[in-house]
């Protein structure tokens, strides 16, 4: 989920997730959802083969074919865990071609307490035979325009989606993001993206844990963020907040070696 209130984590159920929201540009009150989707596009089959849907209502990406990188707020701790089902290989969650694999272990970021450090790894019982998504190890790619994708809600308060949706969101500076969230932003662990002036494009409930990514210098996808939280979905003045993957790249690699 994406946080709604940390400002909220972007979850679809008890733990968080986020979805692509492309909504009307008017302000939203706590009691009123924005207009239905007015933009955004459905991803093509095979366009983002590393995308994974998790049964608790979050997204994720294949760090390895048998390890999913997601958000810490999507899981309830570390240890053996066979309760999560990962679905991969499709954009249509109802497709007969969907690959469904159970989890065996979960590793939540050490020291996670609800603020910052919002990453986790899920070990799968068997590999999902799809390309993986490499992660950024430096801040060199923490700029420009990013892609986000997910099966989460397409409007604030909306339902989860059958088909994978995608959108582009531009980098938002720490200063601009801090003007929206103040001390809630952990600037050395988080990266912001979106349209703070107008709103209208964002991740939303059900996309939490999914990747924010862009092309690297070799024209290959590289993950720079993990969907974490934001105030509502696509509201003017409030960009999305993502775990800054490069900050935790070494810790993620070390943790993966233990699974």
From Swiss-Prot:
InterPro entries given in the database record: Peptidase_S1_PA, Peptidase_S1_PA_chymotrypsin, Peptidase_S1A, Trypsin_dom, TRYPSIN_HIS, TRYPSIN_SER
Pfam families: Trypsin
Disulfide bonds: 58-74, 177-192, 204-233
Keywords: Disulfide bond, Hydrolase, Protease, Serine protease, Signal, Zymogen
A GO molecular-function annotation: serine-type endopeptidase activity
Biological processes annotated in GO: proteolysis
Propeptide: 33-36
Transmembrane segments: none
Domain Peptidase S1, chain residue ranges per copy: 37-257
Signal peptide start and end residues: 1-32
Domain of life according to the entry: Bacteria
The keyword ATP-binding appears for this protein: no
Enzyme active site: 73 (charge relay system), 118 (charge relay system), 208 (charge relay system)
EC number: 3.4.21.4
Class of enzymatic activity (EC top level): hydrolase
Record-marked site positions (Required for specificity): 202
PROSITE patterns with a match to the protein in the record: TRYPSIN_DOM, TRYPSIN_HIS, TRYPSIN_SER
CDD domains recorded: Tryp_SPc
Catalysis: reaction(s): Preferential cleavage: Arg-|-Xaa, Lys-|-Xaa
Family: Belongs to the peptidase S1 family.
Name this polypeptide is given: Trypsin
Gene: sprT
């Amino acid at each position: 989920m994406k946080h709604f209130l940390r400002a909220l984590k972007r979850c679809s159920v008890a733990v968080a997730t986020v979805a692509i929201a492309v909504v009307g540009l008017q302000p939203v009150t706590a009691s009123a959802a924005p207009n239905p989707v007015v933009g955004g596009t459905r991803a093509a089959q095979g366009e983002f083969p590393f995308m994974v849907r998790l049964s608790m209502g979050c997204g994720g990406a294949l760090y390895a074919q048998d390890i999913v990188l997601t958000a810490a707020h999507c899981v309830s701790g570390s240890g053996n865990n066979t309760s999560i089902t990962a679905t991969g290989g499709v954009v249509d969650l109802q497709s007969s071609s969907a690959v469904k694999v159970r989890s065996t272990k979960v590793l939540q970021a050490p020291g996670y307490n609800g603020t910052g450090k919002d990453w986790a790894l899920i070990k799968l019982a068997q590999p999902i035979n799809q390309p993986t998504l490499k992660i950024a190890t430096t801040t060199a790619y923490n700029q420009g325009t990013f892609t986000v994708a997910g099966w989460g809600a397409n409007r604030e308060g909306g339902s989860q989606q059958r088909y994978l949706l995608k959108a582009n969101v531009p980098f938002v500076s720490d200063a601009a993001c801090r003007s929206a969230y103040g001390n809630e932003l952990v600037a050395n662990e988080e990266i912001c993206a979106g349209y703070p002036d107008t709103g209208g494009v964002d991740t939303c409930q059900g996309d939490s844990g999914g990747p924010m990514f862009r092309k690297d210098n070799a024209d290959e996808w590289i993950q720079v963020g993990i969907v974490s939280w934001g105030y509502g979905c696509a509201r003017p003045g409030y960009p999305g907040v993502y775990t800054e993957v490069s900050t935790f790249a070494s810790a993620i690699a070390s943790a993966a070696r233990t699974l």
